[in-house]
C-alpha cells in the first residue's frame, strides 16, 4: 500500500484538464484513510501497519520498516482516535489539491521521527 503522493503546486494544476499536472496530496492523509478501514471494517491494526511499513521496505530491499536494534528509528506517533477533517489549506504539502477535501477522518499522526530525530510535530508543524 502506498500513497501515490505526487503533489503539484497550484500553477501546475491550474491548466486545462489535459495539460494539468497529475497528482494530489496523499502522504499526509494515507494513514488516516487506512485507519478508516480499521475503525469501520475491523481491519487488524497490526496488518494495516505492516502494509505501510515492513512490507514496502522488504519490496524495496530497505533495511527499515521495523523497530529493532541496528535499524534507523523511523516512526510516527499516532492518535488512533483523533477526529479531523481534511482541509487542504492546512496541509504541509506544496500541493493544496486534496481529493478527499472535507472528509472526516479518525486517527491522526501527531509526530514523525527519522533516524530518531523529530521532523514533524503536529503542535509545531514541520521541523525539517
Protein language model regions, located:
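C-terminal cap of metal-dependent C-N hydrolases
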Residues: 16, 72-127
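Catalytic pocket of metal/acid-base enzymes, prominently hydrolases
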Residues: 5, 128
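Hydrophobic faces of well-ordered beta-strands that scaffold small-molecule active sites
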Residues: 1-3
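His/Asp/Glu-enriched, well-ordered alpha-helical/loop segment
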Residues: 6-82
Amino acid at each position: 500500500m502506498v500513497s501515490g503522493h505526487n503533489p503539484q503546486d497550484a500553477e501546475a494544476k491550474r491548466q486545462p484538464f489535459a495539460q494539468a499536472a497529475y497528482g494530489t496530496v496523499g502522504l499526509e492523509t494515507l494513514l488516516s484513510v487506512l485507519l478508516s478501514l480499521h475503525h469501520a471494517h475491523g481491519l487488524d491494526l497490526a496488518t494495516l501497519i505492516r502494509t505501510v511499513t515492513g512490507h514496502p521496505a522488504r519490496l524495496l530491499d530497505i533495511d527499515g520498516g521495523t523497530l529493532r536494534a541496528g535499524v534507523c528509528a523511523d516512526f510516527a506517533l499516532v492518535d488512533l482516535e483523533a477526529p479531523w477533517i481534511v482541509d487542504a489549506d492546512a496541509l504541509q504539502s506544496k500541493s493544496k489539491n486534496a481529493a478527499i477535501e472535507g472528509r472526516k477522518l479518525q486517527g491522526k499522526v501527531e509526530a514523525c521521527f527519522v533516524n530518531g530525530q523529530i521532523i514533524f510535530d503536529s503542535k509545531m508543524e514541520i521541523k525539517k
